Amino acid sequence: VRSRRQRQMCIRDRPAPEQADLAVLVSRFQSAGVPVKYSWIGRELPDDKGLQLTLFRIAQEAMTNILRYAPTTKRVEVTVSRHAGTAVLTVDNDAAPGSRPMHGSGKGLIGMRERAAVYGGTVDAGPTSTGWRVRAVLRWDEDDEGTSPWQMPL
């Protein structure tokens, strides 16, 4: 059994935008001993590296928070549902029976919300009947899939 610090070190590498692959992120967590189920529903994201990185970073923060604040998690489910200019990322974790949640500073949630806002999106987070859920919604113009808000002039 790995310590929490060892598990966090296993997923600490920061990818470049072209490496923002959720499947790779999930496999890092799995190799750190976190039981993760991953599913993608719908088409791939547009070829917008900023959008891809935003989705990746939100998932990374949500999953890292599971390691930090819910070390007794027995199952994590990561789902992306993409349709008509919208991607919905849901990260659910089920805590072990009798575990007590630990609370953080909230800065990670603020960062996730700021990232989502760049794409006209939102992030909601809170307890479920069995654990915790982070749900991010990102939006973009389907007719302009190649223009990232990150590339627009200030």
Please place each PLM-identified region on the residue numbering.
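Short helix-loop "hinge" at the ATP-lid/N-box region of the Bergerat-fold HATPase_c
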Residues: 66-67
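Glycine-rich/acidic phosphate-handling loop/turn and adjacent ATP-lid/helix
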Residues: 88-109
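Single conserved hydrophobic/aromatic residue that forms the stacking wall/gate
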Residues: 1-7, 11
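Short beta-strand/loop element within the Bergerat-fold HATPase_c
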Residues: 75-85, 90-94
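Conserved phosphate/oxyanion-binding catalytic-loop motifs
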Residues: 62, 112
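Conserved short strand/loop->alpha-helix "switch" segment adjacent to the catalytic nucleotide/phosphoryl-transfer site
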Residues: 38-59
